[in-house]
A protein has these predicted regions:
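Short, small-residue-biased leader/transition segments that mark boundaries at the very start
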Residues: 1-3
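Conserved phosphate- and dinucleotide-binding cores of soluble alpha/beta proteins
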Residues: 5-244
Length: 244
């Protein structure tokens, strides 16, 4: 499990779920993991570090005997060890800044150049987990940015390491799918309606040129260029975007 808002939102979702007696094998534990431990949803958690808010930090220290039975901290070379991740059969959940219609994921660089955060152990978990899931909001900046684009501006995780993509609009299970099948699943299930028609149009026109993984290279980064020029990936201001 990676850290960031989307991943924490997923953990908070377990609070009202039917899941119980969960175990977590992660790189970092945050507030949401401690809350799940307190509620009994999470039975045990393993990580290399704990990064929590001051109130949660104070609670852990005040109840250290309680938490030492439920949390273990291991060196990073163990918590992120590919062989261990693979052997445990982990369901890996990581956060994507953006992903493209074929399933390539950018986890670290805004606009392809400005680093927002490091990659951490997400590569170790994505490649070796039994099921590699990436989660993201479908849009950012009040709808001015689509998290799903024709081609990602930076690649941290290739399409070969991504099993499932999830946004609030739905999920795309990419396992066993050819590139064009992946694109159709992503556009249909993960893209916000404000951007879906434009992305479908890009894909349809790219398919007319043929190829295993169709692209329009002259337009592949046009969405990022449009944002740099107009502060929005949308061709025009729209009430739908502002309401999102």
């Amino acid at each position: 499990m990676c850290i960031r808002d989307s991943a924490n939102a997923v953990l908070h979702g377990f609070e009202s779920s039917d899941f119980d007696n969960l175990t977590m094998y992660s790189e970092v534990l945050q507030d949401s993991a401690i809350e799940l431990l307190d509620q009994g949803k999470l039975a045990f958690a393993s990580a290399s570090s704990i990064t929590v808010s001051k109130p949660v930090y104070d609670k852990i220290l005040a109840n250290i005997d309680h938490y030492r039975e439920r949390i273990v901290l291991r060196p990073q070379e163990i918590s992120n060890a590919p062989e261990i991740v693979r052997r445990l059969g982990i369901i890996g959940i990581n956060t994507a800044l953006e992903f493209d219609i074929y399933g390539n994921v950018n986890s670290t660089h805004v606009g392809g150049t400005h680093m927002m955060n490091g990659i951490g152990g997400s590569g170790d978990f994505a490649r070796n987990a039994h099921l590699a899931i990436f989660v993201s909001k479908s849009m950012a900046k009040n709808g001015d940015i689509s998290s799903v684009v024709p081609m990602v501006s930076h690649v941290d995780h290739t399409e070969h390491d991504v099993d499932v993509l999830v946004t609030e609009c739905g999920l795309a299970d990419l396992r066993g799918l050819a590139p064009r099948e992946r694109a159709r699943a992503i556009i249909q299930n993960c893209v916000h309606p404000s951007y879906r028609d434009a992305l479908q149009d890009y894909f349809d026109r790219a398919c007319q040129r043929g190829g295993q993984t169709p692209h329009l290279l002259e337009e592949a980064f046009s969405w990022h260029q449009r944002f740099n020029e107009t502060d929005s990936m949308q061709p025009a201001k729209s009430p739908a975007r502002k309401a999102a």
